């Protein structure tokens, strides 16, 4: 699944004390890609089918978020405030002033949070299948098949359970190669990765029980007022964040969305299912005046 090595550079930068791995490719206006969560997630595995096309038009930055991929793992906490701060520190560390941002799942929450905190620095954003934003807007949904598969991997990290996680993420099972499974499995079981998962679980538990933390997490009163040009993309076959329970209600709560794109044959990682259509929709939106 690897991209041709002549199309990108894999680099590290010190983002306010956090050694952060990122991929950079192309030239032009900067686009920051923010991957979602789950075992073995990284900038490359989240966006490898999209970076080469986006890099034909933009300078693309795909970071490994703190606690993921080859980026450092925090010692004591890994929740949304830490992830949001790390994203802001990364943008500063690579000296970007104004950016386009694209985020998937909990990465889309990070993008929206960055846009709320720094609205003058985000020119446009693309939010892809984000149950995290749905939760921040007060929406609820039943435990999903994808989340159950992820919990099974957390308790029993095997290659078979990694395959089940990936089958929950995408609709096109042909894209789940042995190489992809092995690569994500190695990232998910490296030193520090399991600790990161435990830190995230601890944060989610606190989020359920601490009203003050939930208030900090909430976007209910701020996100609907955001006027940064934004589109949302959702897969009709999403098994992590079902479109009927989260996507359509979220669309109706955000009056300033430029568009809500439904991909009929995509799961949670739309960008890795209907790849050509996704790339075209995103490029057209970002290039439009």
Cite the ranges covered by each PLM segment:
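N-terminal cap/lid segment of alpha/beta-hydrolase-fold proteins
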Residues: 2-19
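Conserved alpha/beta-hydrolase catalytic His-Asp/Glu region
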Residues: 157-222
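Conserved loop-alpha-helix segment in the C-terminal half of the alpha/beta-hydrolase fold
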Residues: 220-266
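Flexible "cap/lid" loop of the alpha/beta hydrolase fold
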Residues: 116, 123-164
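Active-site loop/oxyanion-hole signature of alpha/beta-hydrolase fold enzymes
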Residues: 52, 62-102, 279-283
């Amino acid at each position: 699944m690897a991209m041709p090595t002549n199309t990108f550079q894999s680099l590290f930068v010190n983002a306010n004390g956090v050694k952060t791995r990122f991929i950079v490719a192309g030239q032009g206006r900067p686009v920051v890609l923010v991957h979602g969560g789950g075992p073995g997630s990284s900038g490359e595995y989240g966006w490898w089918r999209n970076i080469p096309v986006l890099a034909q038009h933009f300078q693309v930055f795909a970071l490994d978020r703190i606690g993921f991929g080859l980026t450092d793992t925090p010692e004591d906490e890994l929740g949304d405030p830490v992830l949001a701060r790390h994203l802001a520190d990364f943008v500063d560390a690579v000296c970007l002033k104004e950016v386009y941002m694209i985020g998937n799942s909990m990465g889309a929450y990070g993008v929206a949070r960055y846009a709320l905190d720094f609205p003058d620095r985000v020119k446009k954003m693309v939010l892809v299948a984000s149950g995290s934003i749905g939760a921040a807007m007060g929406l609820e949904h039943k435990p999903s098949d994808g989340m159950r598969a992820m919990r099974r991997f957390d308790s029993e990290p095997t290659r078979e359970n990694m395959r089940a996680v990936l089958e929950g993420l995408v609709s096109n099972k042909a894209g789940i190669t042995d190489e992809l499974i092995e690569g994500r499995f190695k990232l998910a079981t490296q030193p520090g990765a399991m600790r990161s998962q435990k830190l995230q679980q601890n944060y989610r538990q606190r989020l359920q029980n601490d009203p003050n933390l939930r208030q900090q997490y909430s976007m209910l009163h701020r996100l609907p007022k955001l006027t940064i040009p934004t589109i949302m993309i959702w897969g009709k076959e999403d098994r992590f964040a079902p479109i009927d329970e989260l996507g359509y209600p979220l669309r109706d709560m955000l009056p300033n969305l430029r568009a809500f794109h439904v991909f009929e044959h995509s799961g949670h990682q739309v960008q890795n299912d209907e790849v050509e259509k996704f790339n075209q929709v995103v490029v057209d939106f970002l290039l439009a005046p």
